[in-house]
Amino acid sequence: MSEVQILLLLLLSGYLISVSLGMVIIPRILVISHKKRLYDVPDSRKVHTTPVPRLGGLSFFPVVLMSFALVIGFRLYLWPSDLSSFSIEMLHEYLFLFVGMTLLYLVGFCDDLVGVGYRYKFIVQVVSALLLVLSGNWLDTLGGLFGIYSVPALLGVPVTVFAVVYVTNAINLIDGIDGLASGLCCIALSVLSVFFLDRKSVV
C-alpha cells in the first residue's frame, strides 16, 4: 500500500473507532445522568426548554485518547518499516499535549457536576496552553501569509496561549445550542485532516 492509502485507512479507522466507542459509551453515561438526576437546566443562553442530561461530553476525551492510541498502535504494528510520519522523538509532544487535554477535561467534568469558578477555569486553560507550547507546538510561522515566514518566540508563544484560551472559551460559550459546537468542531477537524493528509502526517 502507498503511504497515502495507509493514511486514508488510518483516518477512516480512527473515525470508525471513535463513532463505535461513542455509540457504546454515551448511552450508558446518559443512564447514569438520569438515575442521578444530573441535568442541564434551561436558561436564557440555551435553546432547550426541558432539562437534559449533562454528562454526554464525559465520553469525548477518553474516546479520542483510545482512538488515537489504537490508530498509532496499528500504525506501528502493521507498518513498522515505514514510520516517516511518526518517531519516538515526537513522544514528548504527545505527553505534554495529553496532560493539558486531561486538565481541561477534568475541569470541564467538575464544572458539569458541581460548578467551577471562572478564575480556576482560566488558570487551568492558561496552564494547558503553556503545556502545548512546551510540546513544541506554537505559532512559529505564518507560512508566507502577509509575507511572514518566521515568527519569533516572544510573539508566537503569547499569541498561541491567547488563541488556545480564546478558542476554548468560544467553544464553551456556543455549546449552549445543540449541535453548534460539535458541528463547528467537525468542520474544523475535517479541514485539518485534509491538511494532515496533504502533508502525509497521521496526526
Predicted segments, located by residue:
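"…together with the soluble PPM/PP2C metallo-phosphatase catalytic core" -> "…together
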Residues: 2-203
